[in-house]
Amino acid sequence: VIVSNLPRAVGVTRRAVRKLDPVPEVLELDVTDADQLAALPQQLRDLGVEKLDGVVHAIAFANPKTALGGKFLETEWDDVSVAVHTSTYSYVSLMTALVDILAEHASVVGLTFDATVSWPFYDWMGVAKAGLESANRYLARYLGPKGVRCNLVSAGPLDTMAKTAIPGADAFNDVWGERAPLGWDTKDTTPAAKGIVALLSDWFPAT
């Protein structure tokens, strides 16, 4: 297992992964930087990784002051482009950078949040997630012939650091809890994590 994060946030990641045994390597990576993406395969080879069995894309960002929280009609293109580049296009650009070192029957898993409806406060992140879901279908079309599986996990709201940056995000909690037939606990990341692990495994060879 190898983990990455933005250079400015990599310290937080290093502290978090210390809970794991063995502790994984942590790379500094800005997926919006073409040069860093181009250098990534060699960085992985230098760590002894010849082939990747799976990739988890858990990357998203929209400026909470300008692109979230009910300011949808006022958001300028510069902020929209950051949200789409980081949250949508990076899924494709990351896999384009890694395609030559993907193992046979590798699995790619990304994270989304139901983009079939408009959510209060979610605004341009909702648009970016809709783009991500469409991008995943195209990624599956183009990587499928290489034996690579591409899927997204659409979990309910979880009490993560990312969620705290969304103004009004707690409003999701009650709505999701009321609608989910099996119920939903925003503090329990296990269901989402198990879904990701299952898709990374070989238990879904044609999914």
Question: Where do the protein language model's features map onto the residues?
Answer:
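Short-chain dehydrogenase/reductase
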Residues: 1-78, 91, 95, 136-137, 164-165, 171-172, ...
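Short, small/polar-rich loop/turn modules that mediate ligand/substrate recognition or access, typified
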Residues: 144, 149, 206-207
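C-terminal substrate-recognition "lid" of short-chain dehydrogenase/reductases
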Residues: 185-207
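A glycine/serine/threonine-rich, flexible loop-to-helix segment
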Residues: 15, 124, 145, 155-181
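Catalytic loop of short-chain dehydrogenase/reductase
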Residues: 60-100, 104-145, 157-160
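Residue-level signal for the nucleotide or nucleotide-sugar donor/cofactor binding architecture
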Residues: 32, 89, 186-190
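Hydrophobic structural elements of the Rossmann-like NAD(P)H-binding subdomain
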Residues: 56, 109, 150-153, 163
